[in-house]
Amino acid sequence: MKKIKIGIFGPKGRMGESILEQIKNFSELKLSSLCENKKHSIVGKELAGILVHSDLKKLVNESDVIIDFTIPEATINLLEELRKSKKKTAVVTGTTGFTKSQEKKFLKLCKGLKILQSFNMSLGINILKELVKKTAKIISEESDIEISEIHHNMKRDVPSGTALTLADSVNEGVKVKKKNSYRLQSTNLLRKKNEIVFSSVRGGDV
């Protein structure tokens, strides 16, 4: 059986390192390419028996599927490279923290490409999304909704993609859509009726 060649974009990130370990457990997968930020000290060195590089074109050409857990700018650069390539490499991306303009550009670049995007791919979170949707349908008209989330101290985006996904699940279940509200500093303002308020904590290795 032909093995699926897997390229990892961001192999030295928390998720990248975890994926490297998991690939060993699947005989049908073959680690084929590792691409990291050109300024990272790992570039030019071996990781899991493969020389780490910073060439997006090389990553695309050496992979059947690219797994991407980087930052928005890097993900957009990857998609731009894919659009130039004749090789129809698929991408699984869990990158979060897109601004509205970046998200618009991301969606435009995705057209015609094989892209799977999720802000959180765990089974538990996807079950939770369905529970939140159903709960919101029952109680949200009478309730104030807040989302409190905590992540490790290396997490860049606030609120997290998972928190935003749960807010989307709330809005899938309600009749009157709620607006996301970010309280980044202390204010004397009262919360509004139809809003979802986020609070975020970053610390340790959660």
Indicate where each model-derived feature is located.
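An anion/phosphate-binding loop that grips the pyrophosphate of nucleotide cofactors and donors
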Residues: 63
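Nucleotide donor/acceptor-binding cores
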Residues: 2-4, 89
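N-terminal Rossmann-like NAD(P) cofactor-binding module of classical short-chain dehydrogenase/reductase
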Residues: 66-67
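ADP-ribose/adenylate-binding Rossmann-like module
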Residues: 72, 78-101
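C-terminal substrate-binding/catalytic lobe of Rossmann-fold NAD(P)-dependent oxidoreductases
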Residues: 2, 9-57, 140-206
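Rossmann-fold NAD(P)-binding glycine/threonine-rich loop
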Residues: 94-116, 126-134
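Rossmann-fold dehydrogenase core element
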Residues: 87-90, 105-122, 140-145
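Short glycine/serine/threonine-rich phosphate/pyrophosphate-binding segments
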Residues: 14-19, 74-77, 101-102, 125-128
